[in-house]
């Protein structure tokens, strides 16, 4: 079991719990102060946690560095649910997942037979996927011409994934074949430095950052000229790595390259590129990834409590997590006692659902790996939309691949309870306005904000409105947040407060041990008015917290 599952008992795991260290309840502060303790801030859960608790952004990257070096951190873990980790079973599950996502069943056992690689046609690259130019005329080398264009070079960010043997696996823009020589240089550079017992992490030159993340047997590289720090780019690369694990499992990935070091992984991942593409698009515009947290659908507390209780009652023995979501926002989450979901795994589930419209066609039963929870094997996920014309999607995560009918019955019982209580009508009404307006806060110059409760792992933000209505402006705003975030979480010199003035807007960041707050407001505003607005905003969040957060998470 991955080391990301933690017990609630603070006496055993003081930095992995959301409860006060003495085990007693703490009075919630009415107004925020720099000394506000974790667990008392607006949005803090009162009945424990839903997610693996990461104290801060730095914890995520520190943990990854430890895992990469083989130095396992001391963490508290719950009793892992049983998962099939036999390679035959994993191979069968992968074949089912491949069929679900791409329409083509792929047999790992056949892939590993001697000489099988020669029998396969060369995988098609990503030419045209995200390309900036028109397809070339017949007879030309399409990928080479495309990748040589100035338009290709003008992309703000490129992402490459390759094997340690230098085989291309994925490229964000253009064709992997045309970029194979570039990827070969990248892996040669990594290998050259490692021969001297050094590790390359990033290169900074001419406004570009080149960031390397090595997770054997893969090497991931980002080339960017954005406001993101090298640390944040590395975190995005880790999301790509975990996305690959969610499709293959860590056990299968290791097994493949133990058998064939120069294996072309695109054979197994062919057809799933759109899932990785979608993940990169989400990371470019959804602040959930930047905040390392989940956002809740604004919902009356009584309605959310009824939904959570209905999920809790409609359970099967094999269920580990029951999740209801809409518009990439949480409606409710119920978990097995002592089992905690990692925000990264939840984001990957969101990405899986938003990447495929096939889940709307009926009840899907598909293998899925939650790599931060357990990278060794597949869970089985029952995925369905409650009604064809709504965005309410129900995920029921089970440990038993043969338990489809029992889990499907959980869905039926859950829907019956919602209808009996009239809750389905309240959910429909909430979906009519899945985001709230910043005007509700009542601060004239405030344009947008991000607020994260560190103890609950949840954040809230209003709808992005004018003057950020276009996709370009929304990405620019997120880029400003990324800049503030990178300054606040700088590994060598982190900042607690940042005041940024620009030609189009002013921004303020405030990071404490209990929460993170990023505010964007009119360029006509002053620093004094921004500081004054913090207290008004925090009081508003406190007032609305039972609508914006899940304060009483339930367990089986």
Curated annotation (Swiss-Prot):
InterPro entries assigned: FUZ/MON1/HPS1_longin_1, FUZ/MON1/HPS1_longin_2, FUZ/MON1/HPS1_longin_3, Mon1
Residues with Phosphothreonine modification: 61
One Pfam family named in its UniProt record: Fuz_longin_3
GO MF annotation, one: guanyl-nucleotide exchange factor activity
Presence of keyword Transmembrane: no
Tissue expression: Widely expressed (at protein level).
Gene Ontology terms: biological process: establishment of localization in cell; intracellular iron ion homeostasis; protein secretion; protein targeting to vacuole; protein transport; vesicle-mediated transport
GO annotation, cellular component aspect: Mon1-Ccz1 complex
Positions of post-translational Phosphoserine modification: 31, 56, 79, 91
Key words, A-Z: Guanine-nucleotide releasing factor, Phosphoprotein
Composition bias type Basic and acidic residues, residue spans: 1-12
Span list, region Disordered: 1-88, 113-149
Subunit note: Interacts with CCZ1. Found in a complex with RMC1, CCZ1, MON1A and MON1B. The MON1A-CCZ1B complex interacts with RIMOC1. The MON1A-CCZ1B complex interacts with RAB7A and this interaction is enhanced in the presence of RIMOC1.
Known role: Plays an important role in membrane trafficking through the secretory apparatus. Not involved in endocytic trafficking to lysosomes. Acts in concert with CCZ1, as a guanine exchange factor (GEF) for RAB7, promotes the exchange of GDP to GTP, converting it from an inactive GDP-bound form into an active GTP-bound form.
UniProt record similarity statement: Belongs to the MON1/SAND family.
Family matches, as PANTHER family: SAND PROTEIN-RELATED, VACUOLAR FUSION PROTEIN MON1 HOMOLOG A
Protein name: Vacuolar fusion protein MON1 homolog A
Lineage of producing organism: Eukaryota, Metazoa, Chordata, Craniata, Vertebrata
